């Protein structure tokens, strides 16, 4: 709803839509929302008739993002009081971060973190994922998450561990943990934005490496071409965005993080009559690294492009190569 409103898509009453969003976010007897509002998180020992699955940790993180979306819409509509309330609520992700383990962790209604927590375990407190996969679900405040983790260097190390800490041969993974690269599960949507977070710590070549790996190895022209459940079209949406060379880590931000393109040229013919073009003439399975970028013929050094740039009919050009370009080059 908020993404559509901010992009001017859809014929609906934004005031009524905001009213519905706020009402839904304040259903105190539904899926732990009352406790979330009171404590700042959904406790794992919360019981209610709508909370059969538990999923307390993942709910807390998703509610925080939902709150941020409501705040953005309220701010755009000039509803300062609502915006302030929900921006504050959007920081609730901090309440489930345990500095002792450096993971998001379930808490009970007394504030105690779950004992014997294992980040690679699949528990009832996290929806179809584990602690590694849901740690990064703070799409609205990546800088804040980096700060919690201890800065860019520590955050980059944790990302590296995500992709290199492989399940053991004896681990029995659930059905939804497919397309695994370390603890990253491309077959399950909560992981999908994580590859692009290397941009936030000034290591875009790692984003480029992993995006290319996933596109070339986990999407195949065969009956088993998708490595996981298509859930609402997200597996395909990730591929379409990534193949063009960018991806919306935070969908309502209006920004698309740059990855690595798959095709020498892509054109988007827009409803406003303009055409957005992505060019990467030297791209290949070997030439996956972006050596330089131009936007409308001028050097461009940002790690993202914006919705406005796309809709203006801009031309994005990538010089590709087989050698990575690191931050010290």
Where in this protein do the model-derived segments appear?
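Active-site-adjacent, His/Asp/Glu-enriched structural segments that form or flank metal-binding
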Residues: 2-6
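Active-site core of glycosidic bond-cleaving carbohydrate-active enzymes
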Residues: 8-91, 95-277, 282, 308, ...
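Short strand-turn-strand beta-turns centered on an Asx-Gly dipeptide
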Residues: 271, 295-298
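Surface loops and adjacent helix of pleckstrin homology
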Residues: 281, 298, 321
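Beta-strand-rich binding/interaction modules
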Residues: 286-292
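Solvent-exposed beta-strand/loop surfaces of large extracellular or lumenal domains
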Residues: 297-306
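Conserved "repeat-terminator" motif of extracellular CCP/Sushi domains
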Residues: 316-324
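Short, basic, low-complexity termini and linkers enriched in Ser/Thr/Gly/Pro
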Residues: 325-329
């Amino acid at each position: 709803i908020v993404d559509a409103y901010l992009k001017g898509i859809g014929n609906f009453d934004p005031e009524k839509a905001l009213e519905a969003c706020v009402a839904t976010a304040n259903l105190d007897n539904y899926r732990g929302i009352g406790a979330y509002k009171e404590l700042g998180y959904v406790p794992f020992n919360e019981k209610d008739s709508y909370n059969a699955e538990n999923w307390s940790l993942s709910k807390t993180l998703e509610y925080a993002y939902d709150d941020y979306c409501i705040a953005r819409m309220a701010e755009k509509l000039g509803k300062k009081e609502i915006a302030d309330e929900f921006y504050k609520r959007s920081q609730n992700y901090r309440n489930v971060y345990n500095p002792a383990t450096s993971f998001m962790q379930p808490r009970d209604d007394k504030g105690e973190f779950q004992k014997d927590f294992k980040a690679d375990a699949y528990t009832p407190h996290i929806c179809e994922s584990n602690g590694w996969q849901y740690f990064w679900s703070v799409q609205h405040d990546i800088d804040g998450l980096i700060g919690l983790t201890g800065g860019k260097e520590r955050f980059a190390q944790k990302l590296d561990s995500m992709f290199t800490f492989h399940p053991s041969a004896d681990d029995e993974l659930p059905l939804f943990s497919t397309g695994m690269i370390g603890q990253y599960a491309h077959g399950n949507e909560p992981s999908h934005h994580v590859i692009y977070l290397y941009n936030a710590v000034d290591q875009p070549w790692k984003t480029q490496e992993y995006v290319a790996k996933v596109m070339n190895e986990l999407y195949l022209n065969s009956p088993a071409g998708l490595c996981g459940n298509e859930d609402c079209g997200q597996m395909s949406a990730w591929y379409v965005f990534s193949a063009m060379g960018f991806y919306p880590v935070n969908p309502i931000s209006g920004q698309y993080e740059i990855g690595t393109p798959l095709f020498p040229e892509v054109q988007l013919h827009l409803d406003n009559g303009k055409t957005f073009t992505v060019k990467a003439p030297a791209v290949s399975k070997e030439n996956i690294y972006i050596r330089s970028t131009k936007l409308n013929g001028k050097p461009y050094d940002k790690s993202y492009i914006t919705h406005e740039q796309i809709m203006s009919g801009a031309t994005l050009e990538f010089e590709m190569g087989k050698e990575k370009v690191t931050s010290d080059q």
